[in-house]
Each structure stands twice: as structure tokens, then as C-alpha cells.
Amino acid sequence: MSTIPTDLKFASSHEWVRKEDDGSYTVGITEHAQELLGDMVFVELPEVGDSVSAGAECAVAESVKAASDIYAPISGEVVAVNSSLEDSPELVNSDAYGDGWFFRIMPSDESEVDALLDAEGYQDVIDEA
């Protein structure tokens, strides 16, 4: 069982967000999600400049087991993508909360972050699954 970082917020669909110094939010999938998916073989990311809506599909993670849609945890504009995942999708497995991030969003409504789960709330989601 992995420890869930307390400095992040989480969506029940297993994405995490971290606020950055410039006001954007980095998005990735949780350790729990990557464990369920298994070894990543391909990641399809949104384009910089794309507008995304909270709860909408915006990326795909393909593993040896399955392909899984990745949902935007908050609405806003994609301001960066982790191009390292194109050549090294396994970074999602080795460092889900660090080098395995997917993209960054500049939020259009920062109050949406308040609706996300804290570490304890996300643990409850995992426990109920």
C-alpha cells in the first residue's frame, strides 16, 4: 500500500493535482491508478492551448493490461504537457507523483479545486472500491 501525498488534491477518478508557483496545476494519475493499470506502454496527452472541462476526457494512458481515459480534474487551459512521456511512458509507473505527471492546467475556475478530495478522502475512495 502506497502512502498518499497530503499536499495534493485528488479526483475520485484517480487523478491528482498540485498547485504550482505560477498559479497552474500539475495533473497526473495516482499511484493506486498506475498499480491497477500496470506497465505503461503509451500515453496520449492533450495539446498545449486545449481548453478542458472538469470531468471530461482529455488524455489516454495505455498499459499492457488496458487503455484508460484520463479526466481533467479541473477546467482550464492546458499550458504544458510532459513530453518525456512520449518516449518514456514508464515514468508514470516509477514516479506517479513526480516525473510521471501528465499536463498542467491554468484553471478557469480555481474554486473547482476545493471540490476535489484531500488524501484522506481519496483513501476512502480506494477503500470502498
UniProtKB/Swiss-Prot annotation:
**Is Iron included in the keywords of this UniProt record?**
no
Q: Which cofactor does it need?
A: (R)-lipoate
Q: Which keywords describe this protein according to UniProt?
A: Lipoyl
User: InterPro entries from the xrefs?
Assistant: 2-oxoA_DH_lipoyl-BS (IPR003016), Biotin_lipoyl (IPR000089), GCV_H (IPR002930), GCV_H/Fam206 (IPR033753), GCV_H_sub (IPR017453), Single_hybrid_motif (IPR011053)
Please identify the protein, giving its name as recorded. Glycine cleavage system H protein
Q: Return the HAMAP family for the record.
A: GcvH
Q: How is the cofactor bound?
A: Binds 1 lipoyl cofactor covalently.
Q: Does the keyword Transport apply?
A: no
User: Any idea what job this protein has?
Assistant: The glycine cleavage system catalyzes the degradation of glycine. The H protein shuttles the methylamine group of glycine from the P protein to the T protein.
Name the GO terms of the biological process aspect: glycine decarboxylation via glycine cleavage system
**Organism taxonomic ancestry:** Bacteria, Pseudomonadati, Pseudomonadota, Gammaproteobacteria, Alteromonadales
Q: State the species of origin.
A: Shewanella denitrificans (strain OS217 / ATCC BAA-1090 / DSM 15013)
Q: Where is the Lipoyl-binding domain?
A: 24-106
This protein's GO CC annotations: cytosol; glycine cleavage complex
* Family recorded in the similarity comment: Belongs to the GcvH family.
Residues annotated as carrying N6-lipoyllysine in the record are 65
Assembly and oligomerization:
The glycine cleavage system is composed of four proteins: P, T, L and H.
- Mention any Pfam family matching this sequence: GCV_H
